[in-house]
Amino acid sequence: SEFETRVQNAQAMMRDANMDALLFMTEREFTYFAGFQSNFWQSPTRPWFLIIPAQGKPIAVIPSIGENALSISWIDDVRIWASPNPKDEGISLLAKTLKSLAKSRIGVPMGPETHMRMPANDVTMLRDVLGAVQMVDATDIVRSLRMVKSAREIAKHKHICGLVSDAYETMGARVSAGMSEREILAAHRLDVLARGADTVPYLVSTAGPDGTDDAIRYPNDRPLIAGDVLFIDTGAEIDGYYCDFDRNFAIGQASDATK
């Protein structure tokens, strides 16, 4: 499968980098290698870990609540701990698993656009327990893998971009003076979802005479008037693949300055 190919490619790069294992703890990496999606990632209290050993299939170290859900994925080595358990939120089980696999170096994404989805104190504890086994940066491995998209991935991106583009195309028929940004975005979100998107996690708008220089705030309740330019930025997702692009709409006629 595509997931097996990703893991095998990662393992080849691990060998070249002298890494014994890769450790992932964020939604994007977990989904990329395990093919598992869940809204439970929105909970900050319970971490999830995925380990790619030097050989063989990935190992999941997860809270007990996720055991049944993960069983639908291709991961069959699932190790759980009773959670929530703030005093030991999976760290001892994770350390035990890693020490059985690694004698020298464990790769973890540490570079730009990465983060560790676990408390800083737990990171320190994990390093202490691992002792001589180093945690080293694996950003280049993950970036190199993900920069090359398969035909399936390209089709997913094309599909979600098409859904949002089609929704934008109908915006002119649904937006008029007197409506607020909040009303417009609510209708736009429903339209994108109705077209088949799984989620619309990022949706912002601003409006003002000839436009505004603000592109990140929440919508407001001010009624739009003729001469306003409405900016909408939509980030939507399907099967873990994301699009993010914007459009501008003139309310009534656009002024010469706007044109």
Which residues make up each language-model segment?
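Active-site neighborhoods and metal-handling regions in enzymes and metal-associated proteins
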Residues: 1-259
